[in-house]
């Protein structure tokens, strides 16, 4: 909470490997907030597409797949527990093939719009640290605090190596480069910092340093802001 006691909506965006998940999880614990990882929802949909042999390129079919699936996020101290149709797929969605699939399903505007509505429902009550790629620009454009994390490419590759099972440095470097291009150039919610976001390069910062910096930004919010619209910009 800020000084007024209001539960804030804190948006943390950035590319793969910038440290979003680790930072958001640690920050949420310190604040007593929920931590919601929007990317896990795309990973769950990608996994469902893999399991049902669905094409990543068919927008309409993917949208129907999303609508017919039960994708749930359960906040935990170390991140989110991801449930797909009642099954815990938290580990499976971290594997390389699912990560690559998530990047492909997320480019479709209709899929993103459906996901955005679900994500707004999850965070609308405040008291949430929500991380992803378009939280501050699309999901909650009027979030109380907006952070955009970035890091040097080699640092991001090293971090992803610690997260993804069955991946190599060379494969991850290529994947990150391709994903950056896809994320930044997509028509629906491209990956860009919100105009009012604080941009932090985490390349040479520890997790504690980044969390402390964000806590200072939150503390500088001197008074409660009225609950804002969740309409996209």
Region spans (language model):
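Small-molecule kinase domains that catalyze NTP-dependent phosphoryl transfer to phosphate-bearing small molecules
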Residues: 74, 119-126, 133-138, 142, ...
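Conserved lysine of the Walker
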Residues: 20
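Hydrophobic positions on the alpha1 helix immediately C-terminal to the Walker A/P-loop
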Residues: 23
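ATP-dependent NMP and nucleoside kinases share a basic, alpha-helical "lid"
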Residues: 90-165
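Hydrophobic anchor at the beta1->P-loop junction of P-loop NTPases
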Residues: 10-12
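Glycine-rich phosphate-binding loops of nucleotide-dependent enzymes
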Residues: 146-153, 163-164, 199, 206-221
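P-loop (Walker A) phosphate-binding loop of NTP-binding proteins
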Residues: 15
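N-terminal phosphate/diphosphate-binding loop that engages ATP/GTP or pyrophosphate donors
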Residues: 29-95
């Amino acid at each position: 909470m800020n000084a007024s006691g209001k539960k804030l909506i804190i948006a943390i965006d950035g590319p793969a490997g910038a440290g979003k998940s680790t930072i958001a999880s640690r920050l949420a614990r310190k604040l007593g907030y929920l931590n919601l990882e929007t990317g896990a929802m795309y990973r769950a949909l990608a996994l469902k597409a893999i399991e049902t042999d669905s094409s990543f390129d068919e927008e309409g079919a993917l949208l129907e797949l999303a609508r017919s699936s039960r994708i749930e996020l359960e906040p935990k101290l170390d991140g989110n527990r991801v449930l797909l149709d009642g099954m815990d797929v938290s580990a499976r969605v971290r594997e390389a093939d699912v990560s690559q699939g998530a990047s492909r399903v997320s480019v479709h505007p209709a899929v993103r719009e459906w996901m955005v509505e679900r994500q707004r429902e999850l965070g609308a009550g405040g008291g949430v640290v929500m991380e992803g790629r378009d939280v501050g620009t699309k999901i909650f454009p009027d979030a109380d605090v907006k952070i955009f994390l970035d890091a040097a490419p080699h640092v991001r590759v090293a971090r992803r190596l610690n997260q993804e099972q069955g991946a190599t440095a060379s494969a991850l470097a290529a994947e990150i480069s391709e994903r950056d291009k896809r994320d930044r150039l997509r028509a629906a919610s491209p990956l860009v910092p919100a105009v009012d976001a604080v941009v932090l390069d985490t390349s040479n910062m520890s997790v504690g340093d980044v969390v402390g910096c964000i806590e200072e930004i939150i503390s500088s919010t001197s008074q409660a802001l009225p609950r804002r619209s969740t309409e996209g910009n």
